[in-house]
Amino acid sequence: MANKSIKKFAKIDLEELVRKSETLLANIQFASIDEPVKTVLITSTGPDEGKSTTALALATAMAKAGKRTLIMDCDMRRRSQGKLLGVHPAAGVYSVLSGRAPLKKAVAKTNIPNLYLLDCEPNIANPASVLASQRFAALLRALSRSFDYVVVDTPPVGAFVDAAVAAALVDGVALVVRQRVSKKQAVADALAQLKAADARILGLVMTSVPQEKSDYYYYYNEENRRVKKKHSDGESATLQQTPAEEMSLGLDEDDMQAWARRIGVSAEDLQEAPKAPVRHAGHAATPNASAKKASSSFAPGSFKG
């Protein structure tokens, strides 16, 4: 069972965390009244603050509410969602962005109804550049058309620029801080970095989840060369190195339509959707006709939990 795997790995009560995340979901839904929030990025000021478990709990709460939800692991330096869920897809984010795998092959069902996973490969060089690519932005747009919610798990904004880069592309950002652990100045710096990236900050999520001492900083080493990590459940995972020739692979060098065909989505789904009109008192929003179209081969009906 996926739930047992989560509890064993994270040493947490998932059900309790999901219940608490329902409040976060309610706040996100409230924030969506005027400006829709479908893509949510979860980051933290530093390591071991409960970022990834919070992202999973929020995604699970969304799925339990009957929403087709995708959790997207974009922490290419220390991925964890596949391990937490006990799901190991054949391909990940980078395979899709490079056009080597169709989106259908990369998106995997989980044991939680309505919840899907798009994992990431380990040891990808220059993760921030990958997240800043035109293809990543287009992929997010395609996913937001196929799912009710997309939850993006990124590295801590206080340690790497990855989160700030991706924060500008999503509908909203939640910053995880750990009670009695996160420093006030670190939180202020993280918020300033997100604001500088023009991110829409939904709020702070305070956690106090007990976690074992980890080697997160070592795992996030400068050269990104570490290939083995001892997990908290005693299992040793061997990570594959990314071949040098793949590291320089450009993600914007060819025609976007050709790439769309390779990953199995329509070019129209990669285009930026028109902004929905803002609701004002006494006035109803008029749906945009183009937003109603379901033209992608990666349509909502493609994956049914």
Which sequence ranges carry the predicted segments?
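P-loop NTP-binding module
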Residues: M1-G305
